[in-house]
Amino acid sequence: MKTTTLHVYVMFAEMRGIYDKVNIKIGVSDNPKKRLKGVQTGCPGDVHLIRTFEAGQDAYIHEGHFHKLYKEFSTGGEWFEFDNDYFVEKVLPEMIEYF
């Protein structure tokens, strides 16, 4: 029986004309590259896979942790909007340290 490895992923969606904010998707997938293609289909701008973290069976717990931690930045569902500097200097390092 094949075991599926789950990942928590971080994606960035480009938004035309907006340069001081980043739109970030934090989610779970067993195939983040395939998930990226699905997300790209629904977005007008380019979407990039920034980082994946192998999370195993607890992937949804880890995802939920970050959704709660950043709920004030939520724009709906798994999407969050951060100032560029805040994301680069605080959010991404927190996620890397967490995993």
Region locations from a protein language model:
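Non-catalytic accessory segments flanking enzymatic or RNA/DNA-binding domains
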Residues: M1-F99
